[in-house]
């Protein structure tokens, strides 16, 4: 791990520093970073920097690792500031017995081609033979083609649906505008999926050459016998949709079918989910035993996340599911 870190950030001083550290301290430094000792000029200008930069985005674990069936994909991050995150996740999946799998399909920590980038916010396994992916600013067509080939060959995936995202800061990943929230429901940002502004959608099928363009995401899902009903992020008003999508209103994580975790701030979205049969449960009350979620009940566990949302993601971004029961 030290050697691979030095491949990304070559430095004799860093090599000497890391080589002397016990394992626990080494992990702390790899995550929290290591300040460089400031010389006279840097100190006078208050311009001291990091010998090894910290990893403030590591809590967005979804991007760096993906579990598809029994296999693992290590992300190939778009920006160099996150490259050392790949090394940590790769070390976990390759060497820790608790993270044993059927194999690592693709290890982005070995990838430095600029045209091969892949982040987990763009990868959505919906069924054992179906994955939806986003072509975004963070995930490139070359990497998506490679992912499709690996999924078809080794994972039993039959269909991959590709959503072509706009190059906008509000849609850096597919999970900022689309997430599945129950077996037959998904949460979407309406302008990108409903009406004249809808995004282009492609369907790639194992054993079929090329791709087929689809009228929209819901037509593509119907074509592979996986119909989903949309719930609108922000409700019916465009202004609410835009505001709540910006604050990760589409970014929920399902802890079981029909039970979600999301931000409490997105009130119009919560109201839409309530109309779909969800009950809002505040996380503090759940943890204190003041409220409970019954078996088979639809519920949203809400968290405040006032500072977390400023990082540009939600609960789905901050979780890396390791095992999924079959639907």
Feature locations, PLM:
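The feature marks the mature, well-folded catalytic cores of soluble enzymes
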Residues: 1-327
